[in-house]
Amino acid sequence: MNRRQLLRGSVAVSAAAVLPRAADAQSGTALTFSPSYVRELARALATKPFAAPDEKLPEALKNLNYDQYRSIRFAPEKALWRAEKLPFEVQFFHRGFFYKNRVDIFQVADRSVTPVSYRRDDFSFGEGLGQWPDADLGFAGFRIHAPINKPDYYDELCVFLGASYFRVVAKGQTYGLSARGLAIDTGESKGEEFPVFKAFWLEKPAPSASSMVVHALLDSKSAAASYRFTIRPGQTTVFDVEMALYPRVDLEHAGLAPMTSMFFFGPNDRKDFDDFRPAVHDSDGLSIFNGRGEQLWRPLNNPHDLQVSSFTDVNPGGFGLMQRERNYLAYQDLESSFETRPSLWFEPIGDWGEGAVKLFEIPTKEEVHDNIAALWQPKQPLTAKSEHIFTYRLHWGADAPRADALARFTRTGIGSRGDDSKLFVLELTGDRLKGVDPKTIKGVVTAEKADISNIVTQPNPATGGWRLSFQCSVKGQASIELRAFLAQNDAPVSEVWIYRWTP
């Protein structure tokens, strides 16, 4: 078992065992859906005592190993809306293995709510799984398919499976990092709380629809919430998210728009790794457009000890965990194809006030572990027994949706210059640097508690960009905060590179 599987499947979090009014739907009583339907369920759920999720399963399913669980497959021809040839269709995940929590799924058509029923015949089962009586087991999650690459083939577009995790791809991409509905107490000594999506409502799309709407009900010990996801696939897949949060207790460390990724090693951090591949990561950096108009780039690390970075802000412009390196030769992994992993950009809608972008870098010795997390944490606690509304967009694609007015950093390389110093070599690209007089470009580098020397800026004819290099004294330092950018006539012409060096 690894951390990625643990976080997405086996999180022992409680959720209310019974959905308000869900029993009516399952008994055949017609329910009418409205825009506030799930929001009212979340509001009501937050007023009730917290109850554990339904994990009841036959022993044969509860004790499945990884390979046995993977042998259970949903029949594609049974996909929801397949027969109607709609622009989206849905397949479902069986419960078992780490995915024991029951997730209720409903279809919304013409404002009428009907449950999506579990049918054993919709699945094929591998050999040696044992026997269990027929019963309504519900589902573990679902995935949406759409013709994003070819008009005649429905590719997997997104997956909702495990806790409040979901993964998404755009055209030509493969799964990489994940988003979550909500994070609570990430990085706190008392331990993190993992909310769960306990029910979904899938709006039936029109035959000509270019988007699909999914509603979700989230629950945890500390809060309940509703979500409305409007999913628009394409060259970049966009999620419009409307969230209504109802805390049961004051949330001092709420993580909004949380995202989770993996950084094993790269050109800036190859120590301790004997591997034929030059780099292994789902994301290589955190990009931030802050409320002061700065454009920041923070390369990721796989540190020896947990590292938490906080970037305070007011009304952020956006942030994201990005996979900037898109060249196969940078990875040379034929199976994982890290160059096709999506970047994920968070775009706030409206006034988000004071808070901080938080970055968590967790040590890992295996690439199967998700060890990177980023989120927005409001400065003020989210008060109990109140409604907190958040609206934002998530952009899954090759890059951030914002135009880069400034040159940006594309590679961070670090090498030793003896025991006392490190050589940093930073590559940049961007139209802002094309055709400029090299004599007018200056590298600006600062460091806390360390001396900087040999700052050199020069065009890089091999890339068509620029290179900034410098040396930094590191002797006796537990960590060093570094900051660098290129300037012309004292005005920035590049984003700001920020980095925490650790031994």
UniProtKB/Swiss-Prot annotation:
Source organism, top-level taxon: Bacteria
Residues of the signal peptide: 1-25
InterPro entries reported for this sequence: Gal_mutarotase_sf_dom (IPR011013), GH-type_carb-bd (IPR014718), Glucan_biosyn_MdoG/MdoD (IPR014438), Glucan_biosyn_MdoG_C (IPR007444), Ig-like_fold (IPR013783), Ig_E-set (IPR014756), MdoG_OpgG (IPR023704), TAT_signal (IPR006311)
UniProt keyword terms in alphabetical order: Periplasm, Signal
Functional pathway: Glycan metabolism; osmoregulated periplasmic glucan (OPG) biosynthesis
Keyword Transferase: no
Subcellular location: Periplasm
Coiled-coil intervals, chain numbering: none
An example Gene Ontology CC term for this record: outer membrane-bounded periplasmic space
Biological process annotations from GO: beta-glucan biosynthetic process
Main location (coarse class): periplasm
Post-translational modification: Predicted to be exported by the Tat system. The position of the signal peptide cleavage has not been experimentally proven.
MF term (GO), any: catalytic activity
SUPFAM superfamilies xrefs: E set domains, Galactose mutarotase-like
Reported function: Involved in the biosynthesis of osmoregulated periplasmic glucans (OPGs).
PANTHER family per the UniProt record, alphabetical: GLUCANS BIOSYNTHESIS PROTEIN, GLUCANS BIOSYNTHESIS PROTEIN G
Annotated family: Belongs to the OpgD/OpgG family.
Family annotation (HAMAP family): MdoG_OpgG (MF_01069)
Name of the molecule in the record: Glucans biosynthesis protein G
